[in-house]
Every structure is written in C-alpha cells, then in structure tokens.
From Swiss-Prot:
Key words of the record: ATP-binding, Cell inner membrane, Cell membrane, Membrane, Nucleotide-binding, Phosphate transport, Translocase, Transport
Organism: Chromohalobacter salexigens (strain ATCC BAA-138 / DSM 3043 / CIP 106854 / NCIMB 13768 / 1H11)
Enzyme Commission code(s) on record: 7.3.2.1
Record localization: Cell inner membrane
Family matches, as InterPro entries: AAA+_ATPase, ABC_transporter-like_ATP-bd, ABC_transporter-like_CS, P-loop_NTPase, PstB-like
Protein name according to UniProt: Phosphate import ATP-binding protein PstB 2
Length: 257
C-alpha cells in the first residue's frame, strides 16, 4: 500500500479490468493516484500502461469493442456515472500524446481553440490566457514575437510544448502524458522533463514512459505493470532502489524486458 503522506488522492481506481474484443488488457487493478504529484506508469510494450492512462479520461468510449469492469473515481466522483459530462471530464483530464499534434493554424489559434469552444471571445481575455498557458509550457519567450506564424514552423519539441500549452489553457485538473518525449531529441526531452516537474504545483500529472531513467528523474510515484497486472506501486525512489518484488527488480535492471 502506498502512503501518500501529505498528498491526497486525485484518482481512486478500484478493481479495474478492461478487454479489447474479449482479449484482456487490464486485470483487476486497484491503485490511487495522488494529487499534485507526478505518477509514472512503466512496463514492457503491451503491458497495459497506455490502456490504463486512456481509461482515466474515458478515451476507450470511442471503441465499442472495449469492455470494462471496476470503478475509477476522480476527486470522489465515478467518472462513468450517468450524470458525468464526458466533454467536461476531458477538459478536466487533458491528454498529450506521443507525437506532437498541433492544429493546422497559427500558434495563437492553437492555444485559443479550446478557449473559443468554451465561449471565450474577448481578445484581451484570450491574450491573457494564451500568454499564461505559453509561459506555463515554457514556450512564451520562444514564440511571443511570432504568435501568428503557423504552428508547423516550430520544432518537434516546441510543437509538443505548444500542445501542452493548448491543453493547459482550458485549466485542467490533470494532465495525462503518453510517452511525450519519445520522439524528441535529448535537449527537447530535457525541456519537457523540466516542464513536467514544474507543473505539479498546478495540477496532477500521470506519465507513461518506456524510459525508466526518465521515470526516475521526473516522477514521485511509479507503478510497474506487466501482462495487464499491477505488479508493484511505490514512491519512485523506493521502487528503483529497493523494489519489494523480484519481478520488479528484474525489469528495472534489464534482466527481463
């Protein structure tokens, strides 16, 4: 059992099982994700870590071949309850994918997109929120004189930070990151990692990564998944230096993949 000490839970996941077309992907997972911390999901390809991440904002609803049992609560509320507005859930629980996906429009309009959908139209208000979001994503100083250039003129690392700014602009409570730096060069990866560490004062972050060194650098808690099961979940320092289970030790030391 993980002791969060001063950190209360953001997500409470209870007995979660999920299958694609009757093929099990997650098996009876129970864990808590602490608020205002970085939690990493690690494990080999196909272990279920991205499946678990996407379950946290109901992206699996888009696939009618997925079946689910168990419960996920966000701040105490069952995210699958009938009264839950899925669009509002996905605003509260933002998602950043492996490959940067800026919209084919200007840097400014990328960040403004979600704000306009929320009914924000006044230019002064848009300007203020966009500046705040780009500052929060550590991108403002690089683009502030060129906001109306195409987002596609940015480097890959800048595009990923733009996507993070676009997500932050609508003020989520949680940011889900699925391998956010795997396609980036080392310098861009470092900037993303610094950004992740800095954002936890504002919101809760959940990170999927194949890179165990990255998990060790940026996360406060780490969950090791294998074969759709939660093998071990502990504070990151503990899991990497003194794992409780041999299976965990074998994976993090590279004896098994």
């Amino acid at each position: 059992m993980v002791d969060f000490s001063s950190a209360s839970s953001c997500f409470d996941i209870e007995n979660l099982s999920l299958a694609y077309d009757d093929k099990p992907a997650l098996s009876d997972l129970t864990l808590k994700v602490p608020r205002h911390r970085v939690t990493a999901f690690i494990g080999p390809s196909g272990c279920g870590k991205s499946t678990l991440l996407r379950a946290l904002n109901r992206l699996h609803d888009l696939n009618d071949q997925v079946t689910r049992t168990g419960r996920i609560r966000l701040e105490g509320q069952d995210i699958h309850a009938r009264e839950v507005d899925v669009a509002e859930l996905r605003r509260r629980v933002g998602m950043v994918f492996q490959a940067p996906n800026p919209f084919p429009m200007s840097i400014y309009e990328n960040v403004a997109y979600g704000l306009r959908l929320q009914g924000i139209r006044r230019k002064r208000e848009l300007d203020e929120i966009i500046e705040w979001a780009l500052l929060s994503a550590a991108l403002w100083d690089e683009v502030k004189t060129n906001l109306h250039a195409s987002a596609w003129t940015l480097s890959g690392g800048q595009q990923q930070r733009l996507v993070i700014a676009r997500t932050l602009a609508v003020r989520p409570d949680v940011l889900l990151l699925d391998e956010p730096a795997s396609a980036l060069d080392p310098i861009s990866t470092l900037k993303i990692e610094e950004l992740i560490r800095g954002l936890k004062s504002q919101l809760t972050l959940v990170l999927v990564t194949h890179n165990m060194q990255q998990a060790a650098r940026v996360s406060d808690y780490t969950a090791f998944l294998h074969g759709g099961e939660l093998v071990e979940y502990a504070p990151t320092d503990t899991l990497f230096t003194n794992p409780r289970l041999r299976r965990t030790e074998d994976y993090i030391t590279g004896r098994v993949g």
